[in-house]
């Protein structure tokens, strides 16, 4: 489970603020805030400037994976000498939140999606890799250091920090050429620099967006935690969805304190976007809120 990821990371004392109290908006407050977010989505479609999305661990709690800084989060409980409970990464399945995000992407409301999660569920649910930035990596991914071919594994790659895994590339699928370059893991350690390619893709995404939506993240760790500040400097407003107060609560336009999947599924319902839930969900489907 998540303890495997914990065990792979090096010791690092500054994990941001942990264990903040949860805030629960009333249904009236949620509906009012949801209307504001709905209007941003409508405008995004009308103007052709899709919503820019940042995903945090709160999106995967519906998949039975713990978050990090919540009341039962990995770092919160670690500070108490305990371990967070959850399913093994290898059996975790995309939940309602992942499938709602995919539906909004398919419908053209959102395009670039940054995920801070290393569980691979955003890729697994079907978000196209060209629009997905796995900014902290993916525990199931190996990358060739020579031709940059990617290999998605069934098992966790048991290292972090972009280290060689001992395997070799099987060849560049795009060109058909043999390679045999060394493979490395694709997950950052605490002190690993974020890929320059990722940072360049983020810079380009700002030019194409009308609004920033931060989902299930406390925004404690930079540089991704500073995205609302970047948005403000560009005249772009931000909405956050998180039970706890985020690091930038006072500068965002709307801070929604409610269940992530309830907001996303209700938003899809209000926009008339069909969510393909399949028949293998790890969590219950919420009753969507009516905003009209």
From Swiss-Prot:
Active site: 136 (proton acceptor)
UniProt keyword list: Metal-binding, NAD, Transferase, Zinc
S-S bridge residues: none
Catalytic activity: N(6)-acetyl-L-lysyl-[protein] + NAD(+) + H2O = 2''-O-acetyl-ADP-D-ribose + nicotinamide + L-lysyl-[protein]
Positions of Zn(2+) binding: 144, 147, 163, 169
Positions of the Deacetylase sirtuin-type domain: 31-292
Cofactor note (record): Binds 1 zinc ion per subunit.
Any single GO CC term annotated in Swiss-Prot or TrEMBL for this entry: nuclear pore
Name of the protein this chain belongs to: NAD-dependent protein deacetylase sir-2.4
Originating species: Caenorhabditis elegans
Source taxonomy: Eukaryota, Metazoa, Ecdysozoa, Nematoda, Chromadorea
């Amino acid at each position: 489970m998540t303890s495997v990821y914990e065990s792979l990371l090096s010791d690092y004392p500054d994990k941001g603020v942990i264990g903040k109290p949860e805030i629960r908006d009333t249904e009236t407050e949620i509906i009012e805030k949801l209307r504001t977010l709905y209007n941003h989505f409508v405008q995004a479609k009308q103007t052709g400037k899709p919503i820019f999305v940042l995903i945090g661990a709160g999106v995967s709690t519906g998949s039975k994976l713990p978050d990090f800084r919540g009341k039962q989060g990995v770092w919160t409980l670690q500070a108490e000498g305990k371990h967070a409970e959850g399913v093994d990464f290898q059996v975790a399945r995309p939940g309602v939140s992942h499938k709602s995000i995919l539906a909004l992407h398919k419908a053209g409301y959102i395009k670039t999606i940054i995920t801070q999660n290393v569980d691979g569920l955003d890729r697994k649910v079907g978000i196209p890799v060209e629009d997905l930035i796995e900014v902290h990596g993916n525990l199931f991914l190996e990358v060739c250091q020579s031709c940059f071919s990617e290999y998605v594994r069934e098992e966790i790659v048991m290292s972090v920090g972009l280290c060689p895994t001992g395997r070799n590339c099987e060849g560049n699928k795009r060109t058909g050429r043999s390679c045999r370059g060394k493979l490395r893991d694709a997950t950052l350690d605490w002190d690993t620099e974020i890929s320059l390619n990722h940072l360049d893709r983020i810079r380009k995404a700002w030019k194409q967006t009308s609004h920033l939506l931060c989902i299930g993240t406390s925004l404690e760790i930079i540089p991704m935690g500073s995205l609302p500040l970047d948005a403000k400097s560009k005249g772009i407003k931000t909405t956050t969805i998180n039970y706890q107060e985020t690091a930038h609560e006072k500068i965002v336009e709307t801070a929604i304190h409610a269940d992530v999947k309830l907001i996303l599924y209700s938003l899809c319902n209000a926009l008339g976007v069909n969510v393909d839930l399949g028949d293998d969900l790890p969590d219950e489907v919420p009753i969507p809120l009516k905003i009209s």
